[in-house]
Amino acid sequence: MKKKILASLLLSTVMVSQVAVLTTAHAETTDDKIAAQDNKISNLTAQQQEAQKQVDQIQEQVSAIQAEQSNLQAENDRLQAESKKLEGEITELSKNIVSRNQSLEKQARSAQTNGAVTSYINTIVNSKSITEAISRVAAMSEIVSANNKMLEQQKADKKAISEKQVANNDAINTVIANQQKLADDAQALTTKQAELKAAELSLAAEKATAEGEKASLLEQKAAAEAEARAAAVAEAAYKEKRASQQQSVLASANTNLTAQVQAVSESAAAPVRAKVRPTYSTNASSYPIGECTWGVKTLAPWAGDYWGNGAQWATSAAAAGFRTGSTPQVGAIACWNDGGYGHVAVVTAVESTTRIQVSESNYAGNRTIGNHRGWFNPTTTSEGFVTYIYAD
């Protein structure tokens, strides 16, 4: 009996000991899993924080580009309004200058014909009395004074139109530079937005707990990264194309009016002499490279340095003393005014007033200098009313 009791006690002790060992082992395994999970969560949190920093940095870059685009657009709106105002002021000053020139030329011809000194003496000699002589002399003095005031006003207006033309040209150049910067920023923005999307999807993939959702997000991330790479390739191609176009435009400037005229003639044409204007430079850099004004300045160096947009050239040329008209001539500058920026070109061949050829740049998007349209009617183009500026 004692042996059975002892055996039972020993069996119970062994069973309790085994249960205790199993319970302890199970507790240690669960703790290890919890610790491992905690470590995994901790690592994932750190990775998420790093990914969030990347997203924030790219978002700042995107916001900066968008802010710059907004500022550039606002500046362009302001400069275009300023250019429009200056255009009106230049036109008005040009009219005044041309009108005064006509008056001064008439007075000069009259003085040469009648003789100012002889007329002055005759006025005194033919007076019936000293009082009448004094009155006549006073009247002639007033006329001379008025002429002097007219000359001073003419000088002031010419100075004002020169300053406004420079300011207008600066505004136009800035607008064109801003437009190019906006185009560059648009390409950069596309790349940054694609990178942002990839970073956001990367963050979402790291936060995902379900394997199916994570796999889907990883596929989207790979697609977004491929899109970002494609955008970067497109941006590089855009820059390369732009550089190539710029080289073509600059290379097209290695020409002159004689070469352009000969290109459309069956036999070599006689050289066309440009009017020498010492006050103007032969450098076309005062106009944006590739614009129609730059092309004309390259072919016709006698043109002014700060004549504004193509639509403004006729009034600017008239104010500078150049002759303008409606009859095309080889070597003349054709100036179209469509109510906007307008267009200019150099005439290289003439059959009639409705059939000419020209050399130009920035026609139909082609920014190189050349004959881009052959024979055409200059009076029926979409570019507006045509006026010709003559070198002499």
Curated annotation (Swiss-Prot):
Lacks peptidoglycan-hydrolase activity in vitro, probably due to auto-inhibition by the CC domain. In the homodimer, interaction between the CC domain in one monomer and the hydrolase active site in the peptidase C51/CHAP domain in the other monomer probably mediates auto-inhibition of the hydrolase activity. The keyword Signal applies. It holds the Pfam family CHAP. It comes from the Bacteria. Residues 267-390 form the Peptidase C51 domain. It is found in: Cell membrane; Cell septum; Secreted. The keyword Cell membrane applies. Residues 34-96, 191-227 form a coiled coil. Putative leucine-zipper in coiled-coil (CC) domain essential for function. CC domain probably acts to inhibit peptidoglycan-hydrolase activity of the peptidase C51/CHAP domain. This is Peptidoglycan hydrolase PcsB. It comes from Streptococcus pneumoniae serotype 2 (strain D39 / NCTC 7466).
